[in-house]
Amino acid sequence: MKILISNDDGYQAPGIVQLAQSLTQEHEIIVVAPSENKSASSSSLTFDNPLRPIQISNNVYKIDATPSDCVHLALCGFLNEKIDLVVTGINFGANLGDDVIYSGTVAGAIEGRFLGLPSVAISLASWKGQHFETAGIIAKQLINQISHTQLSHDTVLNVNVPDVSLNYIKGFQTTRLGKRHMSEQSVADKDDPTLYWIGENGKEADNGVGTDFHAIANYYVSVTPLQIDLTKYNEIDTVSKWLNQIK
């Protein structure tokens, strides 16, 4: 397969380097990734400035842009090549539960889906970042499986890999997104109290059996199929009744 690779940690990050190394043996890869860290950029696109791809090597390009920018540009004319699959990652840190709303890694995969391609987002579920090689092997296994049994074009898989040696991985689990509590309070800068730092992610609120949190805690690779439709269908009738009461 011809695979477009991107991420939100930047084109030189260890995760994307490992991902490219893991997939290049059996697939044709092209890397189009941000020139620097763009974590938590979600699905933002750049409309107020033109974007300049810079070729680093034969199949690697960097852009001063978000992950969604990179995928969008690559698939909408810049590469002028037929791509079969979009893979983003390997992210440094988990993308579990509500994290997916903010994640540039997941957003890059979603952009691929918007543009008609099956897409996979892969994250190493730890801030230690010790076992990217494990995640690379898992990525290779998943992508090889996809190459034999194609995913539908509107599929996004959110994959989280425990940050452990491969021999500790118990297998794969298909999961749903868990949930976090509200984020921690913002923190004033120690040197300048007029500046604030965004607080840490909230603790796990829904981490029961079947969630991505539970899979990772028990050394399983979590694979969550994502959908783009954010409509809360079970509230449509309630909201309709509420609207009908407006005078």
Swiss-Prot record:
Signal peptide: none annotated. InterPro entries: SurE (IPR030048), SurE-like_Pase/nucleotidase (IPR002828), SurE-like_sf (IPR036523). Keywords: Cytoplasm, Hydrolase, Metal-binding, Nucleotide-binding. It is found in: Cytoplasm. Its EC number is 3.1.3.5. A divalent metal cation binds at residues 8-9, 39, 91. Its main location: cytoplasm. Binds 1 divalent metal cation per subunit. The keyword Nucleotide-binding applies. Transmembrane segments: none annotated. It catalyses: a ribonucleoside 5'-phosphate + H2O = a ribonucleoside + phosphate. It is an enzyme of class 3 (hydrolase). Pfam families: SurE. One of its GO terms (cellular component) is cytoplasm. Its cofactor is a divalent metal cation. One of its GO terms (molecular function) is metal ion binding. Belongs to the SurE nucleotidase family. PANTHER family: 5'-NUCLEOTIDASE SURE (PTHR30457), 5'_3'-NUCLEOTIDASE SURE (PTHR30457:SF12). NCBIfam families: PRK00346.1-3, PRK00346.1-4, surE. This is 5'-nucleotidase SurE. It comes from Ruthia magnifica subsp. Calyptogena magnifica. The gene is surE.
